Amino acid sequence: MDGWSDLSSAPPQYREVAGIADWALLAQGLGWSINYLAMIYHSYKDRTYGMAILPLCCNFAWEFVYSVIYPSHNSAERAVLTTWMILNLFVMYTAIKFAPNEWQHAPLVRQCLPWIFPVAIAAFTAGHLALAATVGVSKAANWGAFLCFELLTSGAVCQLMSRGSSRGASYTIWLSRFLGSYIGGIFLHVRETHWPQEFGWISHPFVTWHGLMCFSLDIAYVTFLWRIRRQEHRSQRKKAL
């Protein structure tokens, strides 16, 4: 993301291809918007929530910080982040509404749900602000997004495995998240190769590790979802007999 960098200092070779990065960003925005809408739909359909609670709170906090407190100077980026934050409000609403259905087996968690959401959002908001104060807004926006995605992908796998059910999950949710996330590699590549003074850190080993970990978790997610769906279909056929 370049909306918090000093674009006036961008080299000519980056300005020539900045449009490619912006189009990739808009495509990423569309993918994640579809993901949010699909989660909202399946939350009402299955009376559950689609995104694990703590990753959801971290993700919403990040969108709030970089939409409201530190808005991007890039109009495309600002539009994408604002859209995500608005859609995520509805994702958050469905999580608050239906979370008690998933915690019947854990009375303490169920009783604390009204506190877990606001406390977690406040804590993650403070964390994102602290990161921005430590490394600068531009780097914090990117590193914070990496943290959100690591929590989200690992949380999605854990949630699917612990439920043992496809409630709140679908191939649409997975595919829109997968494509919406990894198309981001296009604008990361454009920025790293054409503006290395500002985005040379993209080639660091940690970023490579992050990408491989999240990719592996996304593949694990769709594999588990396929197995669970197959088991559910078999059970339905047996009941029909």
From Swiss-Prot:
Give the protein family: Belongs to the paxB family.
Q: What's an example Gene Ontology biological process for this entry?
A: terpenoid biosynthetic process
Which GO molecular function annotation, any one, does this entry have?
Answer: lyase activity
Origin: domain of life: Eukaryota
Its pathway, per UniProt, is: Secondary metabolite biosynthesis; terpenoid biosynthesis
Record key words, sorted: Lyase, Membrane, Transmembrane, Transmembrane helix
Main location (coarse class): membrane
From the UniProt record, report the name of the gene that encodes this protein.
pyr4
Catalytic activity from the UniProt record: 2-oxo-3-[(8S)-epoxy-(2E,6E)-farnesyl]-6-(pyridin-3-yl)-2H-pyran-4-olate + H(+) = deacetylpyripyropene E
Residue stretches spanning the membrane:
20-40, 49-69, 79-99, 113-133, 141-161, 168-188, 206-226
Q: Where in the cell is it found?
A: Membrane
Name of the protein this chain belongs to = Terpene cyclase pyr4
Q: Give its E.C. classification number.
A: 4.2.3.-
